[in-house]
């Protein structure tokens, strides 16, 4: 009797789970296109905006910085006030940022658009939390989670190929307009098919912890960005930023110890296994993304020291292979 009842519940929920998966995958697409679709278009952006590679690289930096900062607190905010509500807000702002970037007439305007687009940073973890609120069976959740995360490293290379073709044929602005379309589609699907959910307990948001941690992270990030200039780096500025980051992290730690509902429990931050997982993920993704989505495409398009490939060709030759591997092995890992 119990087995029949469980099967019936799974069957009745089947259609809603499929619809939810479609909505969540569309949301992940909206983020992923912002992260990977521009890689083959960076050279085109430099030419059309009449700027330098360094300036275009800076627009990428501000996007990922923005992603990281928003990822620190938006998932927690979703737990407290509603994950669907927060995800819809993220997607609306992402679409707005894409519009600003598409209309950009210079690098500063493009940077503003990319900062706004960075709100999409926490989309992947938020979709996984929303999926788990719907699918609580571990085995089934692991399979569905793997499907969602398998597209996070690149949509089978299609995003890179399409980005290169659009940039080479219609200019870099067309890439952003496609992002707008995908974000709007995701908004509609999430609004219709996703269900609202929150954490079991919903205390007030720890905004003091949010601000102190975000500021500490930003100071450390700026220090790292300055260090990469090597010979031309302002080492006094680096030292100041590192000190500021350390002080703000101490402030964050003490705030969290006193909070009844902290954003991050310091008990977990003291555990070696926490940092092992975080550092492994950070270092791996930093290396892979910097090489495969930055250095390799730029070198392949360089006409002086590289292969001199077009944007459309470099997408297929450098970005598609590893995206296909990720798409194939994500479900296998799950």
Regions found by a protein language model. Give the residues of each.
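Central cavity-lining transmembrane alpha-helices of secondary-active solute carriers
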Residues: 61-75, 125-129, 316-329
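Paired small-residue
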Residues: 97-100, 108-117
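Helix-breaking motifs and short loop linkers at transmembrane-helix boundaries and internal kinks
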Residues: 48-50, 82, 103-109, 171
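Conserved MFS/SLC helix-loop-helix module at the cytosolic interface between two early adjacent transmembrane helices
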Residues: 69-105
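Cytosolic juxtamembrane N-terminal segment immediately preceding the first transmembrane helix
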Residues: 1-33, 47, 259
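Cytoplasmic helix-loop-helix junction between adjacent transmembrane helices
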Residues: 115-150
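12-transmembrane solute porter fold
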Residues: 17-32, 38-40, 53, 236, ...
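Hydrophobic transmembrane-helix bundles of small-molecule transporters
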Residues: 168-280
